[in-house]
A protein has these predicted regions:
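Active-site-adjacent loop/helix surface patches within enzyme catalytic domains
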Residues: 1-120
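Basic/polar, cationic surfaces and motifs that engage anionic cell-wall
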Residues: 89, 95-233
Length: 233
């Protein structure tokens, strides 16, 4: 791990209980330029070869989440560790295994150190669905979940959840449902990525969700219920 300190941080106002995974369409050099230009940061940056850069001390509040919400909490900068991944297509093409292996090692270390629950390892698009598309449809959530990082689901467990309303399910999982369409798309990107079309990086950054979402609603409700079961069990 290499230390490259950024000055864009301040003091935390809450203890660490969440990991937020991001990606950006830059290599390390351009990522650092972008951080400086926009006066933002993350605690860690992982390049495509799996090299980890520590940019902000974990005990400090990095400026990575922006306007955000998850399970009733706003401003996730306060209570989270932010990890950025270099991804030229903004998470729309497969991540190199070396990069994912490095991420897994880092997340497992942080999870043990701060006693982070697996369901509190989430993506930037989960906490900011109207603004952000990362870490993208190609991020291997299922692969990480098999290693105790984040959650995945079994559709058979949907029948164990009585709730049927989409908005209520999204809210119980953790999403900000002020814009239900954006929350729905963020959920689909995370848990049903096969339904997410590939787009240009420019378009994704302009608007990370479509105005109209065509999806098999019974399948969506089933998946929502199955995910909620994993959180509540």
């Amino acid at each position: 791990m290499e230390r490259l300190t950024l000055p864009y941080f301040d003091e935390r106002e809450a203890s660490i209980d969440t990991i937020v995974i991001h990606c950006l369409a830059y290599d390390v050099e351009d990522a650092l330029k972008s951080f400086v230009q926009n006066e933002v940061s993350a605690h860690f940056l992982i390049d495509e070869k799996g090299k980890i850069y520590n940019l902000v001390d974990e005990q400090k509040r990095a400026w990575h989440a922006g306007i955000s919400f998850w399970k009733g909490k706003t401003n996730l900068n306060h209570n989270s560790v932010g990890i950025e991944l270099c991804s030229p297509m903004l998470g729309q093409s497969p991540y190199p295994m070396r990069q994912i292996s490095a991420l897994i090692r880092l997340c497992q270390h942080l999870k043990r150190k701060y006693h982070i629950k697996k369901e509190r390892i989430i993506g930037h698009s989960d906490i900011a669905p109207t603004r952000k598309p990362d870490p993208g449809k190609a991020f291997p959530w299922h692969f990480l979940a098999r290693r105790g990082l984040g959650i995945w689901y079994n559709k058979k467990n949907a029948k164990k959840i009585a709730v049927e309303d989409e908005k209520a399910l999204l809210e119980k999982i953790g999403y900000d449902v002020t814009n239900q369409n954006a929350a729905r798309w963020a959920f689909i990107r995370h848990f049903m990525p096969a339904f997410i079309p590939t787009d240009t990086v420019e378009n994704l950054l302009k608007k990370p969700y479509p105005d109209e979402i065509k999806i098999d609603m019974p399948l969506l409700i089933q998946t929502l219920k199955a995910v909620l079961f994993e959180i509540e069990k």
